[in-house]
């Protein structure tokens, strides 16, 4: 199979293949243009993987460009966060980071060109009047009384706008297109507005700022972008994208292509809704592991490879659809099953005392870090007279299907010996506090010599040597697949999306690095929390369970 055959196919790549074959372009140049007014989420990750992935596969270039035309809502903090997220996902932009603000002087010149051609005018209608004059989808707009000003008057007024002689909302520059157009975006859209705000890149040099639709297409052209890829909500904006480029003097002529944005079950992607979750403290910040932000997914234990694989699996189409959350979980589960070292942790402990094991003795057992990858090495796990096991792994009575520890019967401790439950001790409420067992010292790494069958295997940790740890059990943030459709999306929050418990982990996890994934055997995949876990206070986040526990709920 050739390299081209191995590439994922989609309609955008088919367009690129044809453009290259026809000689329309000799190379491919894409860009990822986020606005630095918030944190990236997994929907942005889809766009990152698409744009950077295309550049990689076609030996082309991909720019990282910040669409920084709205200084009031932007911050350098978001710039740095976005750069970190792109790098973390495994991508490098070509050359220096680009900013739309790099082109403010050039954009101003193009605005002057449109005015000189009679294609732009300074309007003094208020923002409310502009909305009123624009009309509706069923009714055409009506022209502003300022629409037919002379070129000379518009040039003078635009210069006054730049000089700060108009208050905010008192004047704007509009394109002169068609107030009767069936496309709202073509009804004399605003190109520049007055904003007295300090910009994180240009400081106080400007008090007029270009609008997205004017800036975006020109920035693409100035950077030599061949394929400008965005989501479907910008489909109508393509008409304005083309109109601007058709009416200014510029060499490069990029084209815009649209694909469906990511809609993921049991979460929300709207920046407004995500901001509401944070400001109302429904979650613990933008990097809360329940959030769909890249920083939240990273903190939860998702790997770059799992997110790239997810974006690959869902593909690129023009069809809007809702992606099952289990698809995302499947990607990280597959990744960690293949690559995560194993460890043992007991989340709901009950004590086991092995009465025929020497008091105070410690036997260091050697366990593989991965059952199928000997190259991942081994670790020492201490075995002692007292161990913790999961409370659910013991019953006083059970049927034959129960393959764990039962009173009077045997089970194997993972990587250790066969033990037999002899008796239990209970508290005043009847809760089991201690299980007294014996062990067969001849069963380390082998079956009982007399041929008796021991079918069950359970995990454990030494009661003396294990480390206490806070375990955060994260789950889906909402109880319904499409919370955005609810009248009050916040009312559908899953109150069990975070359950905090205290358990014990094996000593090898004392040095667990932040965000390093582990399979806690029989319990799921976990990672050390990057903000709260310390050597003296271990905190582990559940990334995903061993299996999809929501499937049964959804199929009921």
UniProtKB/Swiss-Prot annotation:
Its main location: cytoplasm. L-glutamine binds at residues 67, 212. Keywords: Aminoacyl-tRNA synthetase, ATP-binding, Cytoplasm, Ligase, Nucleotide-binding, Protein biosynthesis. PANTHER family: GLUTAMATE--TRNA LIGASE, GLUTAMINE-TRNA LIGASE. ATP binds at residues 35-37, 41-47, 231, 261-262, 269-271. GO terms for cellular component: cytosol. Belongs to the class-I aminoacyl-tRNA synthetase family. A motif ('HIGH' region) lies at residues 34-44. A motif ('KMSKS' region) lies at residues 268-272. The gene is glnS. GO terms for biological process: glutaminyl-tRNA aminoacylation; glutamyl-tRNA aminoacylation. It catalyses: tRNA(Gln) + L-glutamine + ATP = L-glutaminyl-tRNA(Gln) + AMP + diphosphate. Transmembrane segments: none annotated. HAMAP family: Gln_tRNA_synth. SUPFAM superfamilies: Nucleotidylyl transferase, Ribosomal protein L25-like. This is Glutamine--tRNA ligase. The keyword DNA-binding does not apply. The keyword ATP-binding applies.
């Amino acid at each position: 199979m050739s390299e081209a055959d191995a590439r994922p196919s989609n309609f955008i790549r088919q367009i690129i293949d044809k453009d290259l074959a026809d000689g329309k372009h000799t190379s491919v140049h894409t860009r990822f243009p986020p606005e630095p007014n918030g944190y990236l989420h997994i929907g942005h990750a889809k766009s990152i993987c698409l744009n950077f992935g295309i550049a990689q596969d076609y030996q082309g270039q991909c720019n990282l460009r910040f669409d920084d035309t709205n200084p009031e809502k932007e911050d350098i903090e978001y710039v740095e966060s976005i750069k970190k997220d792109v790098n973390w996902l495994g991508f490098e932009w070509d050359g220096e980071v680009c900013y739309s603000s790099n082109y403010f002087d050039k954009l101003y010149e193009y605005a002057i060109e449109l005015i000189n051609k009679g294609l732009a005018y300074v309007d003094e209608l208020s923002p409310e009047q502009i909305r009123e004059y624009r009309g509706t989808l069923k009714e055409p707009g009506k022209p502003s009384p300022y629409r037919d000003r002379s070129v000379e008057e518009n040039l003078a007024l635009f210069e006054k706008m730049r000089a700060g002689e108009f208050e905010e909302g008192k004047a704007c520059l509009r394109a002169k297109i068609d107030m009767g157009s069936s496309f709202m975006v073509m009804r004399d859209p605003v190109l520049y507005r007055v904003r007295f705000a300090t910009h994180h890149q240009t400081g106080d040099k400007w008090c007029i700022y270009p609008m997205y639709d004017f800036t975006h297409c020109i920035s693409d052209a100035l950077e030599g972008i061949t394929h400008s890829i965005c989501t479907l909500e910008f489909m109508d904006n393509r008409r304005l994208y083309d109109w601007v480029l058709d009416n200014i003097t510029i060499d490069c002529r990029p084209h815009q292509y649209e694909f469906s944005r990511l809609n993921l079950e049991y979460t929300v992607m709207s920046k407004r809704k995500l901001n509401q979750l944070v400001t109302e403290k429904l979650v613990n910040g933008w990097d809360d592991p329940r959030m769909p932000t890249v920083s939240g997914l990273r903190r939860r234990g998702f790997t770059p490879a799992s997110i790239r694989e997810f974006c690959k699996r869902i593909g690129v189409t023009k069809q809007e659809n809702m992606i099952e959350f289990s698809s995302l979980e499947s990607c990280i589960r597959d990744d960690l099953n293949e690559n995560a070292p194993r460890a043992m942790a007991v989340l709901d402990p009950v004590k086991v005392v092995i009465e025929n094991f020497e008091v105070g003795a410690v036997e260091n057992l050697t366990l593989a870090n991965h059952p199928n990858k000997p190259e991942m090495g081994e670790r020492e796990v201490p075995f002692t007279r007292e161990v913790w096991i999961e409370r659910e792994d013991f019953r006083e009575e059970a049927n034959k299907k129960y393959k764990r520890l039962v009173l009077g019967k045997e089970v194997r401790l993972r990587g250790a010996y066969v033990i037999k439950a002899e008796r239990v001790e209970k508290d005043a409420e009847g809760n089991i506090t201690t299980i007294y067992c014996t062990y067969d010292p001849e069963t380390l790494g082998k079956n009982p010599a007399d041929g008796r069958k021991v079918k069950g295997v359970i995990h454990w940790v030494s009661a003396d040597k294990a480390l206490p740890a806070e375990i955060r059990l994260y789950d889906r943030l909402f109880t319904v697949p499409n919370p955005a459709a609810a009248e009050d999306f916040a009312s559908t929050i899953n109150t069990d999306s975070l359950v905090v418990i205290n358990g014990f982990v094996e000593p090898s996890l004392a040095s667990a690095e932040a965000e390093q994934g582990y399979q806690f055997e029989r319990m799921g995949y976990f990672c050390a929390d990057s903000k709260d876990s310390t050597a003296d206070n271990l905190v582990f986040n559940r990334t995903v369970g061993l299996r999809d526990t929501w499937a049964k709920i959804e199929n009921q």
